[in-house]
Amino acid sequence: MSEQSSGRSGDLRETVRQRYAAAALRVAEGAGASCGPEPVEADDTFGSTLYAADERDTLPAEAVAASLGCGNPTAVAELREGERVLDLGSGGGIDVLLSARRVGPAGRAYGLDMTEEMLALALANAAKAGATNVEFLKGSIEAIPLPANTIDVVISNCVINLSVDKPAVFAETFRVLRPGGRVGVSDVVADDALTVEQRAERGDHVGCIAGALSFAEYRAGLEAAGFTGIEIIPTHPVADGLHSAVVRALKPDA
């Protein structure tokens, strides 16, 4: 990587960090209001409206308000009792808390985030929810701070598109999954016909648009990391030629 591109990647990562830190602080500051925190995203394409009401209503209001995703990966990951699940870019913890319920006391749900403010919010939300089978880790999704072959399921919600090194994300995801483990991700994906420049015209990087991979690029990236059984299924449009999609993949058995 050239010095110029390395600098640009660092700038993008810092922009993303600042955006999510600000979102966490807005939710935390709103928590003291009599009517509860305002959601940081509230439309039909991003945010808490993509979760079923019966799921939202049983979570801390701050976890729901901090939702910035483009789907509900816990609904498609087919989590089972006793499994160990990792959420890449866990934010305020909504998907970690939902996962913790699905895997039960014999399982464990990990959340990984690079933003101190989001981690603090997630820990507070876990305490309010009374969740004892959760753990939040500080770090980047390009260098996951967990041992190899220890996770059953990796989920993520509209975060991989924000990474400046997606091959590293796919390689690290493959590394931490046990043989036979699986991926269940919600992410923004672009039509194959859209160039990188056309994606940038439709939205910025921090808005989960400019950094989106195409369907073909996403599949190729997962295949290069060693994944099989890849499915990329669009669920709803988020911009012209860009979609929220469910991404599933398997790490082959040893």
Describe the residue ranges of each PLM region.
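Short alpha-helix
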Residues: 210-225
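Conserved SAM-binding strand-loop segment of SAM-dependent methyltransferases
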Residues: 129-142
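Short, glycine-/aromatic-enriched active-site segment of Class I SAM-dependent methyltransferases
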Residues: 190-209
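A short glycine-rich, Lys/Arg-flanked "PGG" loop and its adjoining helix->strand segment in the class I
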Residues: 167-182
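Conserved SAM/SAH-binding beta-strand->alpha-helix loop
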Residues: 115-117
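A short acidic, Gly/Pro-enriched loop at the edge of an enzyme's catalytic core
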Residues: 81, 142-153
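Core SAM-dependent methyltransferase catalytic element
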Residues: 225-254
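Conserved alpha-helix/loop element of class I SAM-dependent methyltransferases that forms part
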Residues: 35-84, 95-98, 102
